[in-house]
Amino acid sequence: MLCVALFAVASAVAQEKPYTVVFYNLENLFDIYDDPETHDEEFTPDGAKQWNEIKYQKKLSNMERVLFDIAAIQKDYPIVIGVSEIENRTVLEDLISQPKLKGANYRLCHYDSPDARGVDVAFLYRADVFKLEGSDNIKLVVEELPDFRTRDLVTMWGTIDGEPFYFLVSHWPSRLGGKEASQFKRDACAKQIREIKDSLLNENPATKVVVMGDFNDDPGDKSVSECL
């Protein structure tokens, strides 16, 4: 899943500057090493995927090409990239070290999540444009399931050309067990994010809030059209 958004920010001289923001589900970007604390055995040399260094480097190269193609089309690197399905900080460091992405000088905003498979969400951002002021990870709560574990919501905030921005990236629970049976989980995540967004705008109506992620729902579904 890849989503590209363009927006403009008025500069100090009242001229609008176009910027690109991207969300990219990296679809199981795992390293080749077994993490004894998560269920990542599938992505090891002896696992079901026979995941080895050659396959890992090829995947990194493919991701590099996609992001560089976006930069080529827009004539500039995206200023913020939200990502999901990444195993750890190391795989992100490997990604931003790819030759065609080095020029962007991306920095990372990442937190480990309690997800059983060990996958996280995170941000890559250009510090020359987005002036980071802070970040946090927030547990997504489903009240009906107090022991439920999923990917945390990652947030970061700062300014772009002096304007306040707040970014949120999340990866909502899947449709495992059926769409209708699992809908309440995604609805709960959407409502929690809506509460955060409303709180931010109540505190400062000038804040630009950017919500991105893999919601495992369609725009017409209740979680997106009503709860969010």
What is the meaning of each model-derived region?
Residues 12-99, 105, 109-119, 190-191:
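N-terminal, active-site-proximal structural segment of metallo-dependent hydrolase catalytic domains
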Residues 27, 87, 173, 215-218:
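Catalytic metal-binding/acid-base residues of hydrolase active sites
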